[in-house]
Regions:
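N-terminal secretory signal peptides
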Residues: 1-10, 18-29
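Non-catalytic, solvent-exposed segments at the cell envelope interface
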Residues: 15-16, 34-314
Length: 314
């Protein structure tokens, strides 16, 4: 696998800050000058306590095509205890989308966005309301990355080293021009470029959503390790490399608070869970293949995992 040139400049501390705070930190620094010294002093991370995010990867290629979310996670960031707990939500999970009816959860953002003329804020509100309605979790903000944006941030770290548990082959991986291509990732230690990391995280034809969710966790943890072990990147390096990679409706003062708190987070404080024990393959009334869920159990499991009273399964 091809490895990109590693950008180098400041300390490991700022690299870790950029990675943990992720899109929030990038957004904050890209608009750093409007923050006065007083505003920075007022951005006390501990005062925010915990924040719930819906984090997703959205296909923003064309207005004429659905802006579906291929990747969705409900993430709780605890700024007091420096922990992140995230639940992966399969894109094909059948849910109620408030104001739009029942459909796969992947469609929620698109319904809200297109109803307002391709508006990010409306799309973010639609997916947030969908999470609250179905899972009973209030969402404070949505953070969405484009496909290209994800690749950009991986390349900003010079690629990512992962340990792939088994060979992955996909003969029909969807390309940016709406075609298909073959992708292959051998088992073992491999180094992925940004584009390859995106393919690694998105492919699911061989092992479904469970496999894809596992690979996403592998990449996220490996990126964190990369940030800690490298010579480091300045936050400004990442901003320059990733302008436009993310969209968020998180207020700027909270973005700054996240950026300030990020150095206190470590890989040990990051936990993941999946819904694999509470979902099963099914068919919707329109004939679509879906995941149906045991909704007598899912909300309690998700809420319990996020608040730390239930251990994760990933």
């Amino acid at each position: 696998m091809k490895q990109s040139t590693i950008l180098r400049s400041a300390s490991r501390r700022t690299a870790l800050k950029a990675l943990i705070a992720a899109p929030a930190a990038l957004s904050a620094v890209s608009a750093w000058r409007p923050f006065s010294a007083g505003a920075q002093e007022a951005a006390d991370p501990a005062s925010l306590g915990t924040l719930n995010f819906i984090v997703g990867g959205i296909d923003f290629r064309s207005y004429d095509e659905p802006e579906n979310s291929d990747v969705l996670m409900i993430a709780r960031v605890d700024l007091i205890n420096s922990t992140v707990r995230a639940v992966a939500i399969p894109r094909d999970l059948w849910v109620t989308i408030p104001n739009f009816g029942e459909d796969k959860i992947t469609r929620a953002y698109d319904y809200g966005s297109k109803a307002a003329g391709s508006d990010f804020k409306s799309g973010a509100e639609a997916i947030s309301e969908t999470i609250t309605y179905n899972f009973g979790v209030d969402i404070h903000a949505a953070i969405m990355t484009t496909f290209d944006g994800f690749a950009q941030i991986v390349n900003a770290f010079g690629g990512v080293n992962v340990n792939n548990p088994y060979d992955i082959y996909d003969a029909e991986y969807p390309t940016a021009d709406y075609g298909i291509k073959e992708v292959y990732f051998p088992a073992g230690d491999i180094t992925l470029s940004g584009e390859e990391a995106l393919e690694f995280c998105r492919t699911r034809h061989q092992d479904g959503d469970d496999g894809r969710s596992m690979r996403q966790r592998i990449v996220l943890r490996s990126l964190l390790d990369t940030a800690r072990q490298s010579d480091g990147l300045s936050l400004q390096d990442l901003v320059n490399a990733n302008r436009g990679a993310y969209r968020t409706n998180l207020g700027r003062s909270k973005q700054l608070a996240l950026a300030l708190a990020a150095p206190d987070f470590t890989n040990d404080g990051v936990s993941f869970a999946t819904l694999q024990n509470y979902i099963y393959p099914s068919t919707a009334s329109n004939g679509a293949w879906i995941y149906a869920g045991d909704w007598s159990q899912i909300p309690g499991y998700v809420q319990g995992f996020l608040d730390g009273s239930i251990d994760g399964n990933a």
